[in-house]
Amino acid sequence: MSALGQITITVSRCWNTERNQTDKNPCLHGAYLQLRETVKNKSTHLKKPLMKQAPPWKDHLTFQPLHPAERKTQVWRWQSGNSSDLETTSSASPWPTGSNRDVVLNTLAESCCGLSELITAPPYAGVSIQGFSQIWVLFPFCGGTFHHNEKDVLGLQDFERESVSTSQSRNISLLTLGQLQNCVIGKLTIIDLLTEHLLGVRHGVICFPWGLPSSS
């Protein structure tokens, strides 16, 4: 089995845990998600500029004060280049044509309460989701029921994923980072399924500030 590419989702955060307060001046590497696809030594990067003004959280989430760089949602843009080019910038590259990257982006966005844009929150934000007693996570090849505990991540309540029909295989939502960390089924298996289904990539890698999640 040869690797067609690699997907890397990285979260960086800048938070003074010792003093339990944010820096007065936000750093340039504040919390952000970065999705990178590498195929045949060519990289395409999905990124969002920090500090871009946008309506806060679309009234779907309540939150405690965040790092200044994380108080706003940002718009994702694709940019070609290598990892050294991922500096904060106000420029926005046009959406690519003839690809399924928009499908990937929409699928990621749907994981956040059905929002039309993707949002992020650091583990220390105390974020809670209102009006949702369950989060449905549909995978094309997964069945059965699993539980995962959210009490230590994002302040969310427990959620239960129930079995779904394979006829719903095209309706896929992605677990949020906090949920994925505490999910008690094979995390890397889920990632492989998602990346292969969405991008045709057979090998996926996901990284967290607290390290690579291990399968349970």
Swiss-Prot record:
Cellular-component GO terms for this entry: centrosome
**Tissue expression per record:** Isoform 4 is expressed in placenta, lung, kidney and pancreas.
Query: What biological-process GO terms show up in the record?
Result: gamma-tubulin complex localization; mitotic cytokinesis
Q: Which domain of life is it from?
A: Eukaryota
Query: Which GO molecular function entries does the Swiss-Prot or TrEMBL record give?
Result: protein homodimerization activity
- What are the disulphide bonds in this sequence? none
> What illness does the record link it to?
Uric acid nephrolithiasis: A form of nephrolithiasis, a common multifactorial disease characterized by stones formation in the kidney and urinary tract. Nephrolithiasis is due to supersaturation of the urine by stone-forming constituents, including calcium, oxalate and uric acid. Crystals or foreign bodies can act as nidi, upon which ions from the supersaturated urine form microscopic crystalline structures. Uric acid nephrolithiasis occurs when the urine becomes overly concentrated with uric acid and accounts for 20% of all stones.
- What more does the entry say? Isoform 4 (talanin) of ZNF365 does not exist in rodents. In primates, a canonical intron-exon structure exist, with several stop codons preventing talanin production in old world and new world monkeys. It seems therefore that isoform 4 transcript emerged during primate evolution from a noncoding genomic sequence.
Q: What does this protein do?
A: May play a role in uric acid excretion.
Name of the protein in its database record: Talanin
The organism encoding this protein is Homo sapiens (Human)
Question: What are the top taxonomic ranks of the organism?
Answer: Eukaryota, Metazoa, Chordata, Craniata, Vertebrata
